[in-house]
UniProtKB/Swiss-Prot annotation:
Function: May act to induce hypotension. Presents weak hemolytic activity at physiological concentrations (micromolar range), and weak lactate dehydrogenase (LDH) release from mast cells. Does not induce mast cell degranulation, and antimicrobial effects. In vivo, injection into mice induces increase in nociceptive sensibility and causes very reduced or no edema formation. It also causes no alteration in rearing (standing on hind limbs), and reduces locomotion, suggesting an increase in anxiety.
Tissue: Expressed by the venom gland.
Note: The primary structure of this cryptide Pep-7 is identical to that of cryptide TyPep-8 from Tityus serrulatus (AC P84190).
UniProt keyword annotations, A-Z: Cytolysis, Secreted
GO cellular component: extracellular region
Compartment list: Secreted
Highest taxon in the source lineage: Eukaryota
Single biological process term from Gene Ontology: killing of cells of another organism
Keyword Secreted recorded: yes
Organism listed in the record: Tityus obscurus
Protein's UniProt name: Cryptide Pep-7
Main location: secreted
């Protein structure tokens, strides 16, 4: 599971 599965702000 990816911990940072969201684009950088």
């Amino acid at each position: 599971k990816e911990t940072n599965a969201k684009p950088p702000a």
